[in-house]
Amino acid sequence: MDENEYLFKNQAGKKYKTIYADPPWITERGGGKIKRGADKHYPLMKTEDIVNLPIDEIADVNCHLYLWVTNKSLPLGLEVMKAWGFEYITAITWVKDRIGLGQYYRGMTEHCLFGRKGMLPYKLIDGKRAQGKTVIIEPKSEHSRKPKAMREMIEKVSYAPRIELFARERFDGWDCWGNEV
């Protein structure tokens, strides 16, 4: 049994209406042998390995997916989303306060792709449809930590039960899977 099968086994039989994932993408880049990006902080995964995660075992037939991508990994994210059985709906862009890595352009944004599988009715708050925004402006903190506003928006717009894949810490009301929790 490989590591992914083992970790997902802990969720056996549980189906989630919301999946939030920040995969450790391997993307080709130029430069030397110095580790400067994600590979300095944690092991990376090939797109094929991300695609092959048994998401269908944990995704409800009606499910929302939030999938983080960098500018470089955007096409890979769309490929993964489709392979996991989700229809792309929109992207939520995080505008950071500091410049990051890049070759031609140095990034100050990341994107969280939003997709759905099946049909979930809109959540209502006081009789009105719960909606989020497609832009988050929040300062960058430590490497790979995502904005707090994203989780708050997910809780507002999408249904429980929820799971975070490749999680760094635990949050009330969420199941977590990852090598940092």
Which ranges hold each PLM region?
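Class I S-adenosyl-L-methionine-dependent methyltransferase catalytic core
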Residues: 1-181
